[in-house]
């Protein structure tokens, strides 16, 4: 999870969806842990957190990536083939409820 809103929405940004798909279509029960640093007020704050903090930190772990955020540390909403933020997922609630 890249961010969690105070309203309970979970937000992920991923390169190919390998971190989001298992949560959506995977096992019957999934346990997610998120640190206090990922809690934000609104969905706009969640998107801002990913662009300004999580995205640049994540791409920095991948040596050899030359996206604008890897070079400058700031999201440029690029169109690079190495772009790590291709899929965006908002999880509002689970269905059926209680699982």
Protein language model annotation of sequence segments:
Residues 1-99:
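Conserved phosphate- and dinucleotide-binding cores of soluble alpha/beta proteins
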């Amino acid at each position: 999870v890249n961010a969690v809103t105070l309203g309970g929405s979970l937000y992920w940004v991923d390169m190919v969806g390998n971190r989001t798909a298992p949560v959506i279509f995977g096992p019957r029960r999934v346990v997610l842990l998120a640190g206090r640093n990922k809690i934000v007020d609104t969905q706009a704050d969640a998107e801002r957190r990913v662009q300004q903090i999580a995205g640049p930190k994540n791409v920095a772990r991948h040596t050899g990536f030359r996206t604008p955020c890897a070079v400058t540390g700031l999201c440029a909403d690029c169109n690079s083939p190495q772009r790590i933020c291709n899929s965006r997922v908002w999880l509002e609630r689970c269905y059926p409820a209680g699982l």
